[in-house]
Amino acid sequence: MVSALSRVIENPTDPPVKQELDKSDQHQPDQDQPRRRHYRGVRQRPWGKWAAEIRDPKKAARVWLGTFETAEEAALAYDRAALKFKGTKAKLNFPERVQGPTTTTTISHAPRGVSESMNSPPPRPGPPSTTTTSWPMTYNQDILQYAQLLTSNNEVDLSYYTSTLFSQPFSTPSSSSSSSQQTQQQQLQQQQQQREEEEKNYGYNYYNYPRE
């Protein structure tokens, strides 16, 4: 019995768990390597570089496109040649790069003056302009009638006409400030007094002047 135990100790066997771990370690490197993408018209040379070629549909012959450092560069060269030969019907390696996102239409550059007028806000309304009121038409007409009576030969009561003429109210010119209104009113009063004195003197001389 002792001899049998000694033989087992001298020749131990590997446990089954260790054997399965060794098998999984052997398959692990293959899983870590990324799968290479296959591109149209691209082949890898034995020395590692990538060659691109395309078939000309008109001549039915292969066209050499060149040798590139990476497979992506060779695939892009094939896409450019395929668009040249077949147009939009060509099957590409990177269709998203060629077509791209849908472009939105933009407004063309307008002249500077037009763009500024479009962007500038509307002008603000200015302050209300102060308009001066002219003498009433009735007052001007009365003055004209009075002048015509003086030049005519009709005998009228000038004193009565002048009293009724200047007793009528009239509007003074409006201005933006109260001071200007006061000065204008004073000037108008002075002019009115001068006219009354002149007309009274003229009426007095008219009646006292001896007639033939």
Curated annotation (Swiss-Prot):
Family matches, as SMART domains: AP2 (SM00380)
Keyword set includes Transcription regulation: yes
DNA-binding region ranges: 38-95
Tissue: Expressed in pollen grains.
Biased composition (Low complexity): 169-193, 202-212
Induction details: Induced by salt stress. Induced drought stress, jasmonate (JA), salicylic acid (SA), abscisic acid (ABA) and ethylene. Down-regulated by freezing stress. Induced by wounding in the flowering stem. Induced by waterlogging.
Entry-linked SUPFAM superfamilies: DNA-binding domain (SSF54171)
Region: Disordered, residue numbers: 1-49, 96-136, 169-212
Any one GO biological process: glucosinolate metabolic process
Localization of this protein: Nucleus
Cited CDD domains: AP2
Sequence ranges of Basic and acidic residues compositional bias: 17-34
Top-rank taxon: Eukaryota
GO MF assignments: DNA-binding transcription factor activity; transcription cis-regulatory region binding
Keyword tRNA processing: no
GO CC terms of this entry: nucleus
Keywords: Activator, DNA-binding, Ethylene signaling pathway, Nucleus, Stress response, Transcription, Transcription regulation
Family of the protein in this entry: Belongs to the AP2/ERF transcription factor family. ERF subfamily.
Function: Transcriptional activator involved in the regulation of plant development and tolerance to abiotic stresses. Acts as positive regulator of tolerance to waterlogging stress. Delays waterlogging-induced premature senescence by regulating stomatal closure and antioxidant enzyme activity. May function through ABI1-mediated abscisic acid (ABA) signaling pathway. Involved in tissue reunion of wounded inflorescence stems. Required for the division of pith cells in the reunion process, which is dependent on polar-transported auxin and the wound-inducible hormones ethylene and jasmonate.
Protein's UniProt name: Ethylene-responsive transcription factor ERF113
